[in-house]
Amino acid sequence: MKHEPSVTSALSRRGFLKTSTLALGTAGLAAATSAEAAPWFSSGRKLVAKNQVILFQGDSITDAGRSRDKEKTNAPNNQPGLGNGYAWLAAAELLVGRPDDGLKIFNRGISGHKVFQLADRWQADCLDFKPDVLSILIGVNDIWHSLDPKLNYKGTVEIYERDYHALVERTQRALPKLKLVVCEPFVLRCGAVSDKWFPEFDRYRAAAKRVAAQHHATFVPFQAMFDVAVKYAPPEHWAGDGVHPSPAGAALMAHFWVKAVGA
């Protein structure tokens, strides 16, 4: 059996920093687009084709302050509608690299949401778009809100996984040709993230990975990425509160998302 290179062995300090489009100019961007820059992160799949609709879904990490103005959110490739986070930066990278492909990219992340809240709005905010590629990043609120007694949320990892499976099954029934991307929930050990998150948070990550595997989705291991990133800059550099990525964190996510979908 051929083994994938490990995260730590595949990346030198220089190689890792080259994968960040923040770090360097044109030469760095060229290096970042090569498969050699991060072989452990490439899924080997080519998900994005011409004239496709790409939809980002999730919570505040995806939302990233996007506009709620219908004219802006219903227009593809619109910066206010895409927000200020990784979804916008991933869209920008796709649109720079594939200017003639007619891609239409949307963001429907909503701050604070958990899996069951995605399900409540799924018809209008996902299925009606008929996306060709759907990317979901969800899970941090499913644990975070359960840790805050003031919110009185009684969620568990079992509820999270059950609801996630149901959401994906519903989506794949409605859109049988859909290409699905499941992003790994992640946190960094700073800010709002304390020891009480663990080891339970790792169970949520494992659940998301099982959902991806069962439904043949491309899995984007963001936690693995940030676990390497903190070797070269402190956690606060990537996400000041441990949950919401900084500009550097969002840019790193965007670049590796694009790598993972083979675009």
Residues covered by each model-derived region:
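Active-site segments of SGNH/GDSL-like serine hydrolases
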Residues: 141-147, 168-203
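Cell-envelope and extracellular/periplasmic
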Residues: 54-56, 60-62, 67-78, 107-113, ...
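Catalytic His-Asp segment of secreted/periplasmic serine-dependent ester chemistry enzymes
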Residues: 7, 185-263
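Mature catalytic domains of secreted/periplasmic carbohydrate-active enzymes
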Residues: 97-103, 159-162, 173, 181, ...
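Serine-esterase "nucleophile elbow" of acetyl-processing enzymes
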Residues: 38-108, 123-130
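N-terminal secretory signal peptides
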Residues: 1-12
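N-terminal export leaders
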Residues: 12-32
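Alpha-helix N-cap and loop-to-helix initiation/capping positions
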Residues: 78-82, 151-159, 195-203
